[in-house]
Amino acid sequence: MRALVALLAVFCGCSPPPSYDKDDCPLYSELGPVRANPAGAMGRNLEAQFTFKVCPPETGVAEIRRKRIELKQALLKLMSAKTTDALEDPLRIEKLQREVHLLVNKEILKKTKVQEVYVTGFEVK
């Protein structure tokens, strides 16, 4: 009896592997530039562009397209909170990439996930 319970736990408790290869996940780059005024940086503007690798392939891009406005608002909020010191950090783009990746997967997307975030443009004016 214990063996049967153990087998059921093993087979029912594990989720199947994804039915897609993560390398085949499409890129979403239709968001356009996001412009913000950083915190305490009067007269300076930050403009960034992002591309997202979204999985699973069929539903990933559809969900991120549906949530485009929410995504842009969340990015604007994140970028507006950046300080002058943060904008001068040599690792600013890498940090922004990680922050955006977490933000999108935790707050925006519910049924799909961003696998990679690419910063395809970054300019402080």
List the model feature ranges, each with a label:
Residues 1-125:
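Flexible, low-complexity charged segments
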